């Protein structure tokens, strides 16, 4: 829709995601920033991939703050990042894994992988940790890792990463799990989005096409270095209280 030019160039992006990420069972290294723990390298990378792809240009500047709010889980639990691109686009990115407000409430209670969530489950993540020893938490983590359970083949909605609003010259676009809402000067249009075959299917398809057919993926090694640079810039900016200027991403 953006590449088609109907709505003009992108002006700004706003995206946020409030989850229970840091209060799910975690391994020791997932609670240490130096080992890639916290929300930035695991979750921020997804969010920064999204805005970089949409903005369509390299990042020039990052100004950010982070939250380390729990001594028992002493790593980045949240961040707020203002990202400027060399083409003039500005993206405001927020992520919180503090396990209180759940932004899926604003996504019709559709979870990140496209399956419906029960709002009555509020507080379950923190509650499950209350009586767990460290060994118990590690055991619980092993039971949740990749391949430990089988997801249904088709989700009723598409995957998402929280509310996402894109402002263009001639319209605002709000991306939801089932549709894209287009807000022009005088009317609103809702464009249905086709379902993918299953959770993570586009990721596995990109990997298969790269290996089997030599198709260049969007998220190449060079691309991922750019996203990693943004993650480190968020930490540096938050620590120093100043913008960080980039040259790779």
Segments from the language model and where they lie:
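Predominantly a Rossmann-like dinucleotide-binding segment in NAD(P)-dependent oxidoreductases
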Residues: 1-93, 97-114, 241
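A general structural signal for short secondary-structure boundary/capping elements
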Residues: 6, 30-31, 58-61, 88, ...
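Short coil/turn segments
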Residues: 18, 195-200
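A short local loop/turn or secondary-structure capping micro-motif enriched for an aromatic residue
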Residues: 99-103, 182-185, 199-200
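C-terminal helix-rich "cap/oligomerization" subdomain common to oxidoreductases
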Residues: 135-138, 142, 147-148, 154-157, ...
């Amino acid at each position: 829709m953006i590449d088609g030019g109907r709505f003009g160039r992108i002006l700004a992006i706003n995206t946020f995601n409030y989850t229970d990420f840091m209060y799910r069972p975690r391994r020791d290294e997932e609670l240490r920033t130096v080992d890639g723990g916290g929300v930035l390298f695991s979750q921020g990378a997804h969010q920064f991939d999204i805005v970089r792809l949409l903005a369509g240009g390299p990042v020039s500047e990052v100004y950010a703050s982070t939250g380390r709010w729990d001594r028992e889980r002493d790593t980045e639990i949240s961040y707020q990042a203002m990202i400027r691109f060399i083409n003039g686009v500005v993206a405001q990115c927020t992520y919180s894994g503090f396990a209180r407000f759940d932004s899926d409430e604003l996504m019709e209670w559709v979870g990140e992988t496209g399956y419906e969530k029960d709002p009555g489950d509020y507080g379950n993540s923190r509650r499950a940790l209350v009586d767990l020893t460290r060994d118990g938490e590690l055991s619980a983590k092993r039971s949740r890792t990749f391949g430990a359970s089988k997801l249904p083949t088709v989700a009723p909605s598409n995957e998402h990463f929280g509310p996402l609003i894109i402002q263009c010259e001639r319209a605002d676009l709000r991306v939801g799990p089932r549709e894209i809402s287009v807000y022009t000067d005088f009317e609103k249009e809702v464009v249905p989005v086709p379902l993918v075959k299953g959770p993570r299917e586009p990721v596995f398809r990109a990997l298969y096409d790269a290996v089997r057919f030599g198709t260049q993926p969007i998220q190449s090694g060079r691309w991922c270095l750019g996203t990693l640079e943004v993650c480190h810039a968020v930490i540096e900016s938050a620590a120093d209280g100043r913008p960080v200027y980039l040259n790779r991403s």
